[in-house]
Regions:
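PLP-dependent aminotransferase-like
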Residues: 114-174
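Active-site phosphate-binding strand-loop segment of PLP-dependent enzymes
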Residues: 148-209
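N-terminal "arm"/small-domain region of PLP-dependent enzymes with the aminotransferase-like
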Residues: 1-73, 404
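Conserved beta-loop-alpha segment that forms the PLP phosphate-binding cup at the N-terminus of a helix
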Residues: 90-116, 129
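Active-site PLP attachment segment
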Residues: 219-258, 264-275
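Conserved N-terminal alpha-helix of the aminotransferase class I/II PLP-enzyme fold
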Residues: 55-97
Length: 450
């Protein structure tokens, strides 16, 4: 889709693939094609597990549903809507995860023997793409924050030096952001790459929300990057393994499609494609409001965690104008070593003892991934009331309750209060545990949703 089409602002209320599947479902077509479960009839256990609605639209490519390898109707329309929503010249629906998106991006830019400038902390999919195409990496080694033990972004002078020393490189690749939410100066790096006649590629596996959030770091397309791989399933709400590849006006979409078709399946999942279609519509219509709330939730959690002491939930205070040019405020990263626990230990405690599954834990940090799905009863924003402790059973809590140390929540905002939780709180109080978090320091009352 060309630039003028992008500016027309298509009707983002549409979801062409979803609409086509709904029409197809109503046609009651008799299946003598694949998949062999025949709309679930051939595998009742699978149907019972996933549901008839799901297996009923797990179908093969056909004329009314278009073909992912050569889209001409509803898939093409869905890609045009995605490009419009993300401010790209063209968008490709990807069903092999962002790994396939990243690899297609690199294979488009690089041939055997070409050099590509990239940070050392790239995802393995980038390096696997270099193995496939025979391109040569030129590494930029980002600095490491000594206290937190995390890699930062690429400094402008590091990228400038790499471009100067490798003038024949064909592209510069940037993480936008890193796993921990660290962003490089993307606009400056794009300009340096373009001034040197190179493409700028962005791995935005963790940056879908940048396209829909005021106050968040700049997105790759807004910064002028040539290609970006976007994990819609991470923070955008689509199904796992669904992704987007976005390109700018300087990259030929026909060639990109050829590259994608070298490795992507010829049996594109309509479950994944429809999830991309529906999720794009949701983001286009409601994403800005939702991600503003997500950022507010993360900031509230940072303040509460840092008030406990011992833990350090880091944020925009890390920004230094260069190696940490910006920070993704939706990321809730917490440094744990100061309380004598490795991040992986806190990860295990949260999962095994509290049934809380966070994204990961490393040697010194944990990461809780907040996204479009983290709006538990609007707990941070809804009206609240204070009730005596024992009268809160069955209510939704609107504040933290924790013993310190270790400072791990017994109750968190948005969590329903059970009898067992109340028993535990009273037991901990009776044993003299230091209780923190609630507005009432004696925890005789709790704030709940009104």
């Amino acid at each position: 889709m060309n630039e003028s089409r992008t500016r027309t602002k298509l009707d983002q209320r549409r979801a062409p693939i979803y609409e086509a599947l709904e029409q197809f479902r109503q046609m009651r077509v008799v299946p003598f094609d694949v998949p062999g479960h025949k709309r679930g009839r051939g595998n009742p256990e699978l149907t019972a597990f996933l549901g008839q609605q799901c297996v009923g639209v797990d179908v093969n490519s056909m004329k009314p549903l278009d073909n992912l390898c050569h889209p001409v109707s509803v898939i093409r329309e869905a890609e045009e809507l995605a490009a419009d929503a993300f401010g790209a010249a063209h968008a490709f629906l990807m069903v092999g995860g962002t790994t396939s998106s990243v690899q297609s991006m690199v294979l488009t830019a690089c041939k055997r023997g070409d050099e590509i400038i990239l940070p050392r902390n790239v995802h393995r999919s980038v390096l696997n793409a270099l193995v496939l195409c025979g391109a040569v990496p030129v590494y930029v080694n980002p600095e490491v924050d000594k206290r937190l033990g995390i890699s930062l972004g690429m400094k402008r002078e590091q990228v400038e030096k790499a471009i100067r020393e490798h003038p024949n490189a064909v592209a510069v690749l940037v993480n936008n952001p890193t796993y921990y939410g660290i962003c490089s100066d993307l606009r400056a790096i794009v300009k340096m790459a373009h001034d040197a006649g190179m493409l700028c590629l962005a791995d935005e596996a963790h940056g879908t929300h940048f396209y829909f959030g005021g106050g968040l770091p700049v997105s790759a397309m807004a910064a002028g990057a040539d290609m970006a791989s976007v994990s819609m399933h991470k923070s955008g709400g689509s199904l796992t393994q669904s992704s987007l590849l976005l390109i700018g006006p300087n990259v030929h979409p026909g060639y990109v499609r050829q590259i994608i078709n070298l490795t992507q399946t010829t049996s594109g999942s309509y479950l994944l494609m429809s999830s991309l279609d529906i999720s794009r519509r949701n983001l286009a219509l409601r994403g800005r409001q939702v991600f503003h709330q997500v950022a507010d939730m993360a900031e509230y959690a940072r303040e509460e965690i840092n008030a406990v002491g011992g833990y350090y939930a880091f944020g925009k205070e890390l920004c230094n104008g260069n190696s940490v040019f910006d920070f993704d405020t939706t990321k809730l990263s917490v440094h744990t070593l100061d309380i004598g626990l490795a991040g992986i230990e806190v990860y295990d405690i949260l999962r095994d003892e509290y049934d809380i599954q966070i994204e990961f834990g490393d040697i010194g940090n944990i990461l809780a991934y907040l996204s479009i799905g983290d709006r538990p009863q609007e707990a941070f924003y809804a009206p609240k009331k204070s009730l005596p402790l024992r009268e809160t059973e069955g209510m939704v809590c609107s504040e933290f309750v924790m013993c310190y140390p270790p400072g791990i929540p017994i109750l968190a905002p948005g969590e329903r209060i059970t009898k067992e939780i109340l028993n535990y709180i009273e037991y901990a109080k009776a044993k003299g545990c230091s209780m923190t978090g609630p507005e009432d320091p004696d925890i005789l009352h709790l704030n709940v949703l009104a």
